[in-house]
Amino acid sequence: MTGLFYRKEINEDKFLKIGLIYDLKTSLESSTFSQLERRIPNSLNVLVIDTIANDISREYIIPKNYGFGISYEILDRLSFGIDLRFQPWKENSGYEGQDNSYKNFLQISSGFEIIPDAEDVNSYFKRVTYRGGLLFKRYPYLINGEETNNIAATFGLSLPVGSISRINLGFEIGKRGS
């Protein structure tokens, strides 16, 4: 995967960040062996009846991948952003010689992070980082001819432990499927 990242300083503690990713299409090669066999009752022996496929090589294409993200940050206070990812699976036919239909993969996610006061030594909860987000994914595969989508809300906390350590907790609630 290849990417570009640009960070623009708006002023001393405010930043605009932009990122792009691109991944070339790749292929997976596999070989298939399939045989028809019969198990002999009350025995560990197997009777091979017929070899259906022996060492058939196949190629499976994983399509290229594009992504774009933009975020705004106020240092040690606030950050929010949005990411988009796209993968053109629709042009992929799956294994060579098989009729597979795919949809294009799409992911849209957005989120925020708030730290009320990172330097307040008198209030633990003002140093906690609070996170939230929304997510939509359209998966490339079909189940029973139907699209499979994922819609979710995410929540998280980053709890300070000592002077430099943190415990991160994340939760996701949503629906996958149609």
Task: Give short role names for the model-derived ranges.
Residues M1-S178:
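Outer-membrane beta-barrel porins/channels
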